[in-house]
Amino acid sequence: SDIAKDKAARLLKKRGSISSLGSHDVKPRGSFSKTKDSVSTVSYIDEPGHHDDIQRPAILVENTYQMGPTKRFPVASVNNILKDVLTSYLQEEKYEAELCRQMTKTISEVIKARVKDLMIPRYKIIVLIYIGQLNDQGMRVGSRCIWDPANDTFSSYSFKNSSLFALANVYGVYYE
């Protein structure tokens, strides 16, 4: 017990912390415990009134006055990423509902990571993946967005094999 107190005191001195080592005379409430001493530590405490009188200066950050992107969203590069990822992940796959559900999550994360690797500053990246069974049916997918047509854009790629289809959309929305 004394060894534990000494060790705790040394650690507290090194860290500059406050300890309630003086509470060793507090006995446990129940008779089921054989421990006689109590050791508790606080790694950091702010003394009351210490910082209350000091006003910290506000951090001022200057505006960049940048109203448009320095680098445009590379639609062609993103389109190549979409083609590459969809083809590599789905070329030999057969449609299975549970597998395709997991594949949409995986493919969207891979595409998002690869688009982020292009390091396009100040663009939010949104990736949507649709995978369905190819069974002589039709489907229309539409999207509507409120955005700035001068800076915001998208890239889209559709893929088919013998049993499934996939559509990948990547939206690049400029964030000021």
UniProtKB/Swiss-Prot annotation:
Pfam family, one: Tctex-1
InterPro entries associated with the record: Tctex-1-like, Tctex-1-like_sf
Gene3D superfamilies membership: Tctex-1
Molecular-function GO term, any one: dynein intermediate chain binding
Biological process (GO), any one: microtubule-based movement
One GO cellular component, as annotated: cytoplasm
Domain of life: Eukaryota
Family listed: Belongs to the dynein light chain Tctex-type family.
PANTHER family: DYNEIN LIGHT CHAIN TCTEX-TYPE 5, T-COMPLEX-ASSOCIATED-TESTIS-EXPRESSED 1/ DYNEIN LIGHT CHAIN
Protein name, as recorded: Dynein light chain Tctex-type 5-B
